[in-house]
Curated annotation (Swiss-Prot):
Designated name of the protein: Photosystem I P700 chlorophyll a apoprotein A2
Subunit structure: The PsaA/B heterodimer binds the P700 chlorophyll special pair and subsequent electron acceptors. PSI consists of a core antenna complex that captures photons, and an electron transfer chain that converts photonic excitation into a charge separation. The eukaryotic PSI reaction center is composed of at least 11 subunits.
GO annotation terms (biological process): photosynthesis
Binding site for chlorophyll a B1: H654
GO cellular component term, pick one: photosystem I
Residues that bind [4Fe-4S] cluster: C559, C568
Catalysed reactions, as listed in the record: reduced [plastocyanin] + hnu + oxidized [2Fe-2S]-[ferredoxin] = oxidized [plastocyanin] + reduced [2Fe-2S]-[ferredoxin]
Places the protein is found: Plastid, Chloroplast thylakoid membrane
Topology within the bilayer: Multi-pass membrane protein
Organism: Agrostis stolonifera (Creeping bentgrass)
InterPro entries, per database record: PSI_PsaA/B (IPR001280), PSI_PsaA/B_CS (IPR020586), PSI_PsaA/B_sf (IPR036408), PSI_PsaB (IPR006244)
Lineage: Eukaryota, Viridiplantae, Streptophyta, Embryophyta, Tracheophyta
Magnesium among keywords: yes
Single GO term (MF): chlorophyll binding
Amino acid sequence: MELRFPRFSQGLAQDPTTRRIWFGIATAHDFESHDDITEERLYQNIFASHFGQLAIIFLWTSGNLFHVAWQGNFESWIQDPLHVRPIAHAIWDPHFGQPAVEAFTRGGAAGPVNIAYSGVYQWWYTIGLRTNEDLYTGALFLLFLSTLSLVAGWLHLQPKWKPSLSWFKNAESRLNHHLSGLFGVSSLAWTGHLVHVAIPASRGEYVRWNNFLDVLPYPQGLGPLLTGQWNLYAQNPDSSNHLFGTAQGAGTAILTLLGGFHPQTQSLWLTDIAHHHLAIAFIFLIAGHMYRTNFGIGHSIKDLLEAHTPPGGRLGRGHKGLYDTINNSIHFQLGLALASLGVITSLVAQHMYSLPAYAFIAQDFTTQAALYTHHQYIAGFIMTGAFAHGAIFFIRDYNPEQNEDNVLARMLDHKEAIISHLSWASLFLGFHTLGLYVHNDVMLAFGTPEKQILIEPIFAQWIQSAHGKTTYGFDILLSSTNGPAFNAGRSLWLPGWLNAVNENSNSLFLTIGPGDFLVHHAIALGLHTTTLILVKGALDARGSKLMPDKKDFGYSFPCDGPGRGGTCDISAWDAFYLAVFWMLNTIGWVTFYWHWKHITLWQGNVSQFNESSTYLMGWLRDYLWLNSSQLINGYNPFGMNSLSVWAWMFLFGHLVWATGFMFLISWRGYWQELIETLAWAHERTPLANLIRWRDKPVALSIVQARLVGLAHFSVGYIFTYAAFLIASTSGKFG
């Protein structure tokens, strides 16, 4: 018998319909479901594929460096970071003739180019890169790492180099190595790079391999370290009139605690950043010696978990049985990893703009907007994935006997209470927030804006005040000049921090009012509803009141008629699918809020946000409509400009988004009938009927069509907003 795709499933390979192709693609990466898979081979396949993933990442970052070195303007950008526009790469073939060529020739380039809104120029400049040669060197090194990763991936699939199952299940050793090696050593190495290369570069000193051993990063070298006078490393920091990249106003300190921002670059002090990474390295190097391996010192994770039992009362058996449950479930581990990564990605979005680490990035407004939006959307997808794999864990890996009366079992036991409380919170937030917005809308429409219900966010203002913001007049903690907290930090990091918090030229602790209060609660509604759908999907994955027997139906069973009371939208996959729409919706509100508030801040007209954000028509008219004008003008009767590509992407994004509904709002019968008609016509058309196919064409399954619809909806939604965001910001600020 000939081998047909998919080789990993003989059952599917013998399917006579086109279902074979689509199901084959859908399950290609679901190694667990493949024929003759063993637990050991499963782990080995996943391990090897990680090297492939690394190879792609290294190749991609190498490409960034290479194209900027080849076609960019890094060296001229360095001379004037605030006014030269950074070039990402050239455009080979600008369509639409001479006007397009002229529109896209910018940034001092000889021909049409794309502008970089990724922040890589600021990043490379901050870490000490200065020439195109530096960029080429980096690109080659990453290309080498990419090749090395591919070789490592192939190598770990060879019989002699395949790790055993026991190696994968050795959680203590893995944690020690990841904590010490991955986080500890890499943070220490990064501190080293900052101290030996980046900080000297910021002071006009060019350190490379040829003079690396000759240039002391600190005048007294290791002396203060060896004599215990560590405070010397913080003495004589860069002054407030330091010009970044030059010796003018530069100090000699390497590890400081200045707080706040460098006045010229509006980014964190490099010496503060180095200090931070050194502290992180210290903590993680210690943490990496915490767990017991074959040396017989440290904690056993299993013992730790078994010991975590409540002292008394009806609180169950705590963490008993959790070690084996987690250690034997790849989906549980992936769920935990994705949840952590999702949170950290969202925190990256928040901190990249509020505490910018890269020189001059805070004054590149389009880049700030792009990076915030990019990281928030990625966080959303990763976090929904965490719950998806949590649900798969319950279906494939959860063993009730192993987890009797522990925290996992008890979550399942009182899932109705969890779900109903989340539901209540979502309903409360939704009705009250919408009620306030709509009330305010009506008041504006009737010409009585003074009758709006405007609520000051006094608790949030109080928290900001506790951190040192004096605008609101709360005399508390760091905003109280005679408090112990204020006095304790006055000589250390406080002057810089307090200046940063109370200065209106940055994004740290923006002044908030009734508009912020409302949109905050709209976002809270989105977060709680998304969480409700995801949590319910995971907790009901094995069985629910309607259908107690879900286990054998798997993760993604489709609608199954009225026989069991109707099984539409009750598989764990359906919950994930519905949650992604809510996730996109929520992050839409988050990014609208962030962008509008910042546009008004950067333009110096914050009153526009404050006055228009308290009612829905304000958002529609003064944010969306007003800011889409540049976009819609990309093409006009007078020709075109450099925003035309975003205008096109805006339209194209809407098209992709709308295509999603074709898959989401239709039934299989319609498509099957259409397919049969087309196949019939094909077979009866001369010449066309010379082309035959073996698989009988059938419509997509319900689950597949939903996936295709969701993919188009998501991609179109993000493309549309990306074009709007970049065009409206760069159209105003360049």
